[in-house]
Amino acid sequence: MLKKLKNFILFSSIFSPIAFAISCSNTGVVKQEDVSVSQGQWDKSITFGVSEAWLNKKKGGEKVNKEVINTFLENFKKEFNKLKNANDKTKNFDDVDFKVTPIQDFTVLLNNLSTDNPELDFGINASGKLVEFLKNNPGIITPALETTTNSFVFDKEKDKFYVDGTDSDPLVKIAKEINKIFVETPYASWTDENHKWNGNVYQSVYDPTVQANFYRGMIWIKGNDETLAKIKKAWNDKDWNTFRNFGILHGKDNSFSKFKLEETILKNHFQNKFTTLNEDRSAHPNAYKQKSADTLGTLDDFHIAFSEEGSFAWTHNKSATKPFETKANEKMEALIVTNPIPYDVGVFRKSVNQLEQNLIVQTFINLAKNKQDTYGPLLGYNGYKKIDNFQKEIVEVYEKAIK
């Protein structure tokens, strides 16, 4: 579930004892028995960066997420200090308190962590933005935690990438499975009971027994039967000019799930007939509009849209905005999903000591395992994993997704 990208910085599986650490080079592993920390290096207070918009969201004059975050911090402090006191290397150190501070966005989070200012110790960031940041600033912050989410019932395997865009392409096959859920039983007709709406997601679309450490974007198409057939023909013929002229809705230029991942698919599929979205948009400005995919049905001149994979899963069909609504003789369907990109990554400022990092990572894992994480699941984080090798587990997967 990708709803977390809209709402927060911090939050938003295999559960094993603490036995790892990520080096400052972001590629190696430091065994716990090799790590030592002095009393002066021990932080008695740790601050997490949390989305300012989420943290300050109000309803009736009250901050609606205040209780959620307070309960989470209480649970986190209790579990962390239990682990600390059970560890011979840390049991004599002071117990640690935890608090949150508001952060505007992912870019601000990375910039603040890179200053190594103890007013901000940790946050969770989009993997793509993190990888690109570290290319220009190697070793300046320390990735240590990978988030996971309940997998979609139609997409449980990360190792599926673009092949040729035909019906046998694994990414097209996923799109066809999406259509069985979204189109064959029309989304507009879903009831809260039949599809298990819990106030945040349609639970029927997820398999909580399988944790996914990746997400994708997707390309929607819309129209009556004749228009859909023409769009598909342009796709199959690799006729970029005709395809683009059906009009494309997209997200911000820096969005991976609503711009960059789809751009990679278009490059691979249309090859030398396509350059970049920005170049093509400059040449054909009327064919593009920055707007949410769930509004595609309301726009007569646009028939293609980019979105997060399965965004309807966390979009209530009874919303006043009437998401994904189309004209009576038209429908929306998935054309193809994108390559997978790693889910979000937890990052420490450089000087947080290694033992404390280890304990924080294990605390995240334990809270999820014991159903005591009152914060993450509301926004799409259902589990956590330690990162043993940032280069292999995150960077290489990311690079493969966008090439």
Curated annotation (Swiss-Prot):
S-diacylglycerol cysteine-type lipidated residues: 24
Record lipid sites (N-palmitoyl cysteine): 24
Pfam families per UniProt: CypI (PF06646)
Membrane topology, from the record: Lipid-anchor
Signal peptide region: 1-23
Gene Ontology terms describing biological process: regulation of cell migration; regulation of protein phosphorylation
UniProt-annotated location(s): Cell membrane
Gene3D superfamilies recorded: CypI, domain 2, Cypl, domain I
Primary site of residence: membrane
Any one annotated GO CC term: plasma membrane
InterPro entries, per the entry: CypI (IPR010592), CypI_dom_I (IPR043099), CypI_dom_II (IPR043100)
Alphabetical UniProt keywords: Cell membrane, Lipoprotein, Membrane, Palmitate, Signal, Transport
Function: P37 is part of a high-affinity transport system.
Name of the protein in question: High affinity transport system protein p37
